[in-house]
């Protein structure tokens, strides 16, 4: 999605306004049947959790398995933190926003405005962006990067 100014509007338009939750991981056999312990309870994998996308219609999508120390960082929180970094809530433009791999990865870029260099020459305009990236996979850290390279094509 391109060109909306609030984090909420951009996330909604990009279908990235879902929440991610942590769930336990139960062992299943090759046929997909939950394996039960001697008490008849699901056999849980103790050192793993799953990240789960909660969709607007109330359904769930499994995203990844993570360790027990993993803490979910919601897409809205990551984007609002980026807007806080640029000290803006409405005048910086959330340029692009989206998710990859069914929601496992989130990205956004905030247009910080152009910088004119060499005003007596060719007047090159360098676009500046704050890139935001996060993964709900336990492997991709939250990244905030200042860049002059567009993260996605126009």
Predicted features along the sequence, with ranges:
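Intrinsic disorder/low-complexity polar-acidic segments
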Residues: 80-154
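Feature for intrinsically disordered/low-complexity regulatory segments and propeptides
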Residues: 1-81, 90
């Amino acid at each position: 999605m391109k060109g909306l100014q609030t984090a909420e509007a951009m996330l909604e338009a990009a279908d990235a306004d879902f929440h991610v939750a942590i769930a336990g991981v139960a062992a299943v056999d090759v046929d997909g049947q939950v394996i039960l312990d001697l008490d008849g309870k699901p056999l849980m994998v103790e050192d793993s959790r799953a990240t789960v996308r909660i969709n607007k219609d109330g359904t769930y999508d499994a995203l990844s398995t993570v360790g027990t120390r993993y803490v979910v960082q919601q897409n809205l929180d990551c984007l609002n933190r980026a807007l806080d970094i640029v000290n803006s809530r409405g005048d910086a433009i959330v340029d692009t926003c989206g998710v990859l791999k069914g929601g496992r990865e989130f990205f956004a870029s905030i247009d910080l405005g152009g910088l004119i260099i060499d005003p007596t020459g060719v007047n090159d305009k360098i676009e500046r962006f704050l890139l935001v990236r996060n993964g709900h996979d336990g492997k991709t850290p939250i990244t905030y990067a200042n860049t002059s390279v567009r993260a996605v094509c126009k």
